[in-house]
Amino acid sequence: MRPHLLCFILGVLAVAAARAEGGCAPALDFAKRPLAGSEPVRLCEVYRGQVVMIVNTASKCAFTPQYEALEALYAKYRDRGFVVLGFPSNDFGGQEPGTEAQIQEFCRSTYGVKFPMFEKTHAGRAEADPLFRKLGELAGEYPRWNFHKYLLDRDGNLAASFGSFTRPDSREVVEKIEALLGD
């Protein structure tokens, strides 16, 4: 039994060492294609070291005006290492029926969205793609509607999860972002 315990301990130490040497945190260990783009990007490689807010979005939802607050947060804090990543989803009420090109045009022309938007994806628990499945597991909650917000610290660890009714510019969210930015 001791050899098995030793192997287990060495395995845990190897994983910890890999993360310490620039390995990827589980919440960012995914390749995702930018909206209306062709080549996936490794989230870990691009966003490592930043405070990241991941949001499932929709263009025809009562919460759609949250795009404005998300863009304002991004504009205010991006120079300090904060980024919003939007993932359109048609899972809740069929409220994101458009093509990726239509979604991109809507976001830019209606809300001036400049934060990164990614491929249309499944965010709901039943069909969650691997990114949202991992976030749901880490948070202990999956999006129940559009505009669920997951906040990751600079190491890619889940720091908070906010439901659709919590506005991106709410005091609770802003204070958490500022605490994570910490500078």
Task: Locate the predicted segments by residue.
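Amphipathic alpha-helical repeat scaffolds
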Residues: N56-K60
